[in-house]
Curated annotation (Swiss-Prot):
Cross-referenced InterPro entries: Integrase-like_N, TACO1_YebC-like_2nd/3rd_dom, TACO1_YebC_N, Transcrip_reg_TACO1-like, Transcrip_reg_TACO1-like_dom3, YebC-like
Keywords recorded for this protein, A-Z: Cytoplasm, DNA-binding, Transcription, Transcription regulation
Family in the record: Belongs to the TACO1 family.
Localization, UniProt: Cytoplasm
GO cellular component: cytosol
Gene3D superfamilies: 1.10.10.200, 3.30.70.980
Name the record gives this protein: Probable transcriptional regulatory protein Cphamn1_0542
Disulfide bonds, paired cysteine numbers: none
Length: 250
């Protein structure tokens, strides 16, 4: 399994400084609503809802917003019905892309996604065309302050740890099986180790490193998709060469 991508590191840093809080809250509300609809409104018995609530709280979403989203999902309050649709395709340089959406209008969403991909030198594929290149995993980001790699290994060894990425200067990336993400969170809580950005992720088996021109176009495509209102998450197997990294820093 790969996924230790320089692009993934850049995305995490960009997300940490992203000021589009309204857009972020919209995506979080949709995830909470869908989670409550599919698994019930009790986070104690609904891991997906519990994770969505934790993420919302980490991003300072008011509790009233969270509770309204839950009630819309369970039907206690009237709300929009969302369908979850996943699209797959290719971007510049042959990178594979998975786009997860939540929509109340399938026709609008597929038209928007196709338009963005076509406009940015990509192509929309059939279901299954690229998903076989990825594995769904749990991921947590643990800030490096006050914790060592050895401490993390010791705390998480019996809590489902599959991989520990230490390439980021600011945080460790903890990778678990989907079913073990809650156990990893609990182990960190009990050890008094803080974490952030706990989520389900799609991790590529191998990474693709395009040339500088295609890499720049691929970044533009991914960012355009992430800014689409109906898109919840975008995953890719993009890797950036040192040359591309230097051009981004300049």
């Amino acid at each position: 399994m790969s996924g230790h991508s320089k692009w993934a590191t850049i995305k995490r840093k960009k997300a940490a400084t992203d000021q589009k809080r309204g857009n972020l809250f919209t995506k979080l509300v949709r995830e909470i609503t869908i989670a409550a609809k599919t698994g019930g409104g009790d986070p104690g018995g609904n891991p997906r809802l519990r994770l969505a609530i934790d993420t919302a709280k980490m991003n300072s979403m008011p509790n009233d917003n969270i509770q309204r989203a839950i009630k819309k999902g369970t039907g206690e309050l009237e709300g929009v019905t969302y369908d979850e649709i996943t699209y797959e395709g290719y971007g510049p340089g042959g990178i594979a892309i998975i786009i997860e959406t939540a929509t109340d209008n399938r026709n609008r969403t597929v038209a928007d996604v196709r338009h963005i991909i076509n406009r940015n030198n990509g192509s929309l594929g059939e279901n299954g065309s690229v998903s076989w290149m990825f594995q769904r995993k749990g991921r947590l980001e643990v800030p490096r302050d006050g914790v060592s790699e050895e401490q993390l290994m010791e705390v998480l060894l019996d809590a489902g740890l599959e991989d520990l990425d230490s390439e980021d200067d600011n945080c460790f990336s903890v990778i678990t099986a989907v079913k073990d993400l809650e156990a990893a969170k609990k182990a960190l809580d009990e050890a008094g180790i803080g974490y952030e950005n706990a989520k389900m992720d799609m991790i590529p088996d191998t990474l693709v490193e395009p040339g500088i021109d295609d890499a720049s176009k691929a970044i533009k495509l991914i960012e355009a998709l992430e800014n689409c209102d109906d898109v919840q998450a975008v995953y890719s197997n993009l890797e950036l060469s040192e040359q591309v990294m230097n051009s981004l820093d300049s």
